[in-house]
């Protein structure tokens, strides 16, 4: 699996005002989740020279290597996340250099997980992946969160676009929350928005997260799972979902099992009630939850 996303340093302030510094971003949450499934992980990422040796050692000890050429002059991407009772505020503190087409050349993988955190995957890089995928028929999963984010030049506070005219040609699967789904579909939501991405954009697997539900649309089947968990920190849950879904589908070629493993991984992570990367769940706990959801998942033939 190759993951395109910047590694980030997160400063997470919880409801009580406590601040936790943690490595983060899809590269870390998704990469470490994929390692739990026994997958080889290649990160297409960049960090700054401020990225500490202990962080490099931590990733290496968990089977993920940061190569020398991935360390650049720009600072490592950093966010401050403030978690309140009813909402979360995100601020960009520093941003690393964008990824380039040269960064993805000579990478051999059966799955691309494209999940920018703040526009570091330009349109030409995404197009190059899709073009390469057309030749090899690999799996391309997209999480559009980084394309949605707009940074206030004065405060660094991040807001979201209302409209995202993103070319989804060649994308195999997409994960989108309520705001992302509306931006990608011209304001549509729920099942209607998912069907639009499938029929009009050609996305084979559409995953939607809204409130405490995870939905999957594949062909004419709509599946949904309820996650009713109160947690102090859900940072990285979407990244864990995307990676677990990809791993399970690549291994089993069964979308039903894949969404059960995705939801199972999210539940296992949130049940730890830990912050940052400490919430990465074990494979055994993921499997336990996946088997439970396989027997309780709701579905509808459209």
Language-model regions, residue ranges each:
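Conserved N-terminal subdomain of the carbohydrate kinase-like
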Residues: 9-21, 36-116, 120, 125-139, ...
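Conserved phosphate/ATP/ADP-binding segment of small-molecule kinases
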Residues: 146-225
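Short, hydrophobic/glycine-enriched beta-strand segments
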Residues: 1-8, 141
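Short catalytic helix/loop segments, enriched in acidic residues and glycine
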Residues: 18-32
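Alpha-helix C-terminal capping segments
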Residues: 31-40, 248-251
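Short internal beta-strands
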Residues: 42-47, 141-145, 174-178
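Short, conserved phosphate/pyrophosphate- and ester-handling motifs at nucleotide-, phospho-/glycolipid
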Residues: 34, 177, 238
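Conserved post-catalytic alpha-helical subdomain immediately downstream of the catalytic base
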Residues: 202, 227-299
């Amino acid at each position: 699996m190759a993951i395109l996303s910047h590694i980030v340093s997160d400063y997470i302030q919880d409801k009580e005002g406590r601040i936790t510094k943690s490595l983060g971003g899809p590269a870390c949450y998704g990469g470490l989740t994929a390692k739990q499934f026994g997958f080889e992980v290649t990160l297409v990422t960049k960090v700054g020279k401020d990225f500490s040796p202990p962080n490099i050692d931590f990733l290496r000890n968990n089977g993920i290597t940061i190569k020398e050429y991935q360390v650049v002059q720009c600072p490592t991407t950093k966010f401050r996340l403030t978690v309140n009772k009813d909402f979360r505020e995100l601020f960009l503190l520093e941003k690393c250099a964008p990824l380039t087409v040269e960064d993805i050349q000579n990478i051999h993988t059966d799955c691309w997980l494209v999940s920018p955190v703040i526009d570091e995957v330009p349109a030409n890089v995404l197009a190059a992946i899709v073009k390469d995928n057309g030749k090899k028929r690999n799996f391309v999963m997209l999480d559009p969160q980084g394309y949605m984010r707009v940074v206030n030049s004065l405060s660094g506070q991040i807001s979201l676009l209302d409209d995202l005219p993103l070319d989804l040609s060649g994308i195999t699967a997409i994960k989108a929350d309520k705001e992302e789904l509306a931006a990608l579909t011209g304001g549509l939501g729920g099942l209607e928005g998912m069907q639009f991405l499938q029929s009009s954009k050609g996305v084979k697997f559409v995953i939607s997260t809204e409130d405490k539900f995870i939905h999957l649309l594949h062909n004419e089947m709509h599946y949904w799972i309820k996650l009713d968990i109160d947690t102090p920190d859900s940072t990285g849950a979407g990244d864990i979902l995307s990676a677990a879904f990809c791993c399970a589908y690549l291994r089993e070629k069964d979308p039903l099992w894949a969404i059960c493993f995705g939801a199972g991984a999210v539940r296992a992570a949130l049940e730890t009630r830990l912050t940052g990367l400490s919430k990465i769940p074990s494979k055994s706990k993921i499997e336990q939850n996946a088997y439970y959801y396989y027997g309780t998942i709701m579905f509808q033939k459209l």
